[in-house]
Amino acid sequence: MVRSLKKGPFVANDLFKKIEKLNNKGKKKVLVTWSRSSTIVPVMIGHTIAVHNGREHIPVFITDKMVGHKLGEFSLTRTYRGHAKTDKKSKR
């Protein structure tokens, strides 16, 4: 289901405060976060946010086309290594 417009988008408070502080100072810095469920809002455009994928933090540069999506969509948690081969060496 879609979140109610009355409530507004979810953004973690600590992440939002850090971005507001950087915007007031006019600085650009990599922000580290574990909040994959936070929605990208227009205030975040131009910042680089390192999103945790369960093993490491993946830096994500926020552009205007990402607004409305979740941070977790841009740091994949699973690595695809390909299907098993059918040759004789892989059967051993």
Swiss-Prot record:
The top of its lineage is: Eukaryota, Viridiplantae, Chlorophyta, core chlorophytes, Chlorophyceae
Question: What Pfam families does this protein's entry cite?
Answer: Ribosomal_S19
Q: What does the record list as coiled-coil region(s)?
A: none
- The protein's organism comes out as Oedogonium cardiacum
The main location is plastid
Domain of life per record: Eukaryota
Q: Which keywords does this chain's UniProt record carry? A: Chloroplast, Plastid, Ribonucleoprotein, Ribosomal protein, RNA-binding, rRNA-binding
Q: What is this protein called?
A: Small ribosomal subunit protein uS19c
This entry carries the following GO cellular component terms, namely: chloroplast; mitochondrial small ribosomal subunit
What this protein is reported to do is described as: Protein S19 forms a complex with S13 that binds strongly to the 16S ribosomal RNA.
Location relative to the cell: Plastid, Chloroplast
Q: Which GO terms describe its molecular function?
A: rRNA binding; structural constituent of ribosome
**Alphabetical GO biological process terms:** ribosomal small subunit assembly; translation
Task: Tell me its family.
Answer: Belongs to the universal ribosomal protein uS19 family.
